[in-house]
């Protein structure tokens, strides 16, 4: 089963360190940012330690590496041309790094229309993606399903379909299906996941889903908030998320946990992934999981 989490990539080891961290958590796949998600500072491709990283991945049986684009990219912005242009240029740069890392998909939040309205935002995203996807490259941009917080675009399957339909080289667009986001956007992940998948299939097509983000939610269905919770401790619940993780449709697709670190002490929070992965593999909810995470 391809199950992993977001892991860090830093220091001298970079990708090799990411693979070691993923292995420590008992993962078979993992997701990274190529640098800090909130800024444009990046090490050169030569400094990402890619060769040793791939050796470590082979050694630990890790595959289907996923890259996440930084949050600062907003190609839906129509009010500030410089923000749009930075997004286009930086996304192009990130795609080159994704290719060098050997990942097939880079996950992208479609963007926020910052008050101009969803239709204008969608047109701007299409314009940006058409600029980016002219370069010869076989990395896919995985548009993420969004919660609809603020002016986020991509809160409905229809909005995402509109983007895909407008992009010329849309064979290079895939989808990252986020359980927390779709729940927060109003879809019934908890009680009717197959119904949600059927709707997605009709509007976009299940074959587009290449990454799944597995997160519980701190909010009720339709809250449009986007606050992740540990598996089984939120409003989606363990049974529904366990069903998602073991679903036949996602058998060969990397499933990535982005659940929060646990603990009150901000300087000493503990990663939950090893414990959540063990629990999902056992298919049995553990109500004492957070205590076990804290005791590690």
UniProtKB/Swiss-Prot annotation:
Cofactor note: Binds 3 Zn(2+) ions.
Positions that bind Zn(2+) 2: 144, 178, 213, 258
Enzyme Commission no: 3.1.21.2
CDD domains assigned: AP2Ec
Pfam families: AP_endonuc_2
PANTHER family, sorted: APURINIC-APYRIMIDINIC ENDONUCLEASE, ENDONUCLEASE IV ENDODEOXYRIBONUCLEASE IV
Family of the protein in this entry: Belongs to the AP endonuclease 2 family.
Entry protein name: Probable endonuclease 4
């Amino acid at each position: 089963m391809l199950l992993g989490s977001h892991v860090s990539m830093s220091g001298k080891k970079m990708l090799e360190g990411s693979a070691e961290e993923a292995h420590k958590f008992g993962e078979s796949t993992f997701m990274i940012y190529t640098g800090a998600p909130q800024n444009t500072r990046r090490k050169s491709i030569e400094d990402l330690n890619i060769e040793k990283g791939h050796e470590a991945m082979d050694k630990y049986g890790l595959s289907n590496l996923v890259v996440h684009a930084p949050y600062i990219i907003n190609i839906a912005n129509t009010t500030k041309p410089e923000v749009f242009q930075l997004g286009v240029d930086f996304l192009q740069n990130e795609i080159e790094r994704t290719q060098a890392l050997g990942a097939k998909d880079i996950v992208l939040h479609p963007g926020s229309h910052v008050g101009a309205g969803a239709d204008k935002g969608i047109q701007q995203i299409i314009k940006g993606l058409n600029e980016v996807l002219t370069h010869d490259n076989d990395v896919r941009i995985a548009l993420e399903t969004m919660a609809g917080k603020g002016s986020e675009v991509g809160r409905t399957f229809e909005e995402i379909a509109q983007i895909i339909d407008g992009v010329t080289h849309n064979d290079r667009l895939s989808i990252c299906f986020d359980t927390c986001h779709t729940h927060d956007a109003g879809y019934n992940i908890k009680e009717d996941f197959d119904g949600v998948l059927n709707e997605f299939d009709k509007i976009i097509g299940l074959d587009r889903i290449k990454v799944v983000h597995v997160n519980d939610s701190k909010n009720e269905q339709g809250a449009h908030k986007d606050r992740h919770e540990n598996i089984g401790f939120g409003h989606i619940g363990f049974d529904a998320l366990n069903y998602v993780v073991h679903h036949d449709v996602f058998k060969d697709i990397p499933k990535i946990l982005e659940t929060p670190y646990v603990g009150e002490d901000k300087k000493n929070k503990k990663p939950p992934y090893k414990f959540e992965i063990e629990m999902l593999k056992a298919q049995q909810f553990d109500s004492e999981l957070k205590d076990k995470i804290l005791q590690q």
